[in-house]
Every structure is written in C-alpha cells, then in structure tokens.
Amino acid sequence: GGEIYGTIYALSESAHEQGVIWTGSDDGLVHLTRDGGATWQDVTPDAWGEVMVNEIAVSPHDPAVAYAAINRYKFNDFTPMAYVTRDYGENWEEISDGFADEAWVHVVREDPRTPGLLYAGTETGIYVSFNGGDLWQSLQLNLPNTPINDLIVHDRENDLVVATSGRSFWILDDLSPLQQAARDVPDGDENSHHLYSPRHAYRLAGGSGFGGGGEGVNGPSGAVIDFMLGEVAD
C-alpha cells in the first residue's frame, strides 16, 4: 500500500467567517474548526476509504460549501475523484462525471464571479464545469498535457492562472465568456447562438518602443469579441 504519515496536505481558511478552517491530510481525513483551531471536528465521509486529500477549497459564494480533490495514486489507483459538501462537511457528494480515465484530480476551485462555475486541475490537464460539478469537460485548448498543480482566478484581470508541473505558468485570458455561458446560455442547447459581452479594451497613445525581447506571449491587441454558433454555416 501507499505510505502515509498523517501529514496535512491541504489547509483552507474561510473568507466568509473568522476562525473557520478546513484541513485535509494524506491519510484521507478532513477536519473542520469553527473557533480558530481551539476544537476540531472530523467531517471525513466513510465512503472515501484510503485516500489522500490533495486540496480543499471553500466556495467564494457560500460559507457552507467546500470542494475536495482526493486521490489514490499511491495505491496505483488513478481514478479521478472530486467531492463537494454544502453543509460544512455533514454530507459529501461526488462530482467526478466527465473526467478522463486516470486524470486524478489535484484541485477544484469555484469561479469567484459566477456560482456553480468550477475549474479543476488534474494529472493530465484542466477541466471546467458549468453546473456545479454535475458534468466536467476539457478546457485544455493549447495547454500542454501536463499535471495542473494549482489554479486561481486573478481578481483584477479576471484571468485563469495555472501552475503546471514542469511546463511553467499558463494564463487563460478573460474568463467572461465562460462566466456568461454559465449564466446565460441554455444548458445543453446545441442550437444556441450567443454573442458575449467583451471586456474593456484600451487604445494607447504612441510612445517610444521597447528595444528588448521578451519570453512571454501577450494577448492580441484591441477588443476581443467572443461568440458561439450553435450550427456551423456551410
């Protein structure tokens, strides 16, 4: 079996309530304190068995909601497993439908602007769910097939920042089309057409150029307009 040491792998402090902290350990336990660590409650579901709790993330919209990414890769079991609780750990629900085989999950985080819009980093890539985890789909685009160790939505820019294993940092510019799709596009309507509201663009005055080179790749200049066609025209 896999070696475990009772090590805390995940710690998440609530942004809603002072003193509320979640922890997850490599022996599969989840604990919750609501008094700043004076007392702890074991809220581990019995169904998990021998797992490692890789990450716990509190919902930015609901203090009772938390997402847990767990795995059994140390036992040569690469099944993707993600869970959500909506009542401070009293009950847990698995939300793993749609992940590829062996794409075990490193992290699940909820979009800070759109409830129910979730992003997941797995061992083989990145996923998105528009319905609170009921169904996941790939958000890979041109991202290399590499483990996604963590991800975060940039507060000001509204970009998705991704930390990979061995392939550097990647940024998905402007999440507003995904946020609008989660709110406005009819779920499962393949014939839906939608024009997304673009984010602000800036026209800059001329100035002296920068003579040096750079390693990064900037996004396109000007306004970017995103749209969805339910049916591709001939």
Question: Residues of each region from the PLM?
Answer:
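Short solvent-exposed strand-capping/beta-turn motif centered on an Asx-Ser/Thr pair
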Residues: Y73, G230-V232
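Extracellular acidic loop/turn motifs
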Residues: H16, V232-D234
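Beta-propeller blade termini and top-face loops
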Residues: G1-G213, P220-A223
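Short edge beta-strand/loop segments characteristic of extracellular beta-sandwich folds
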Residues: V224-G230
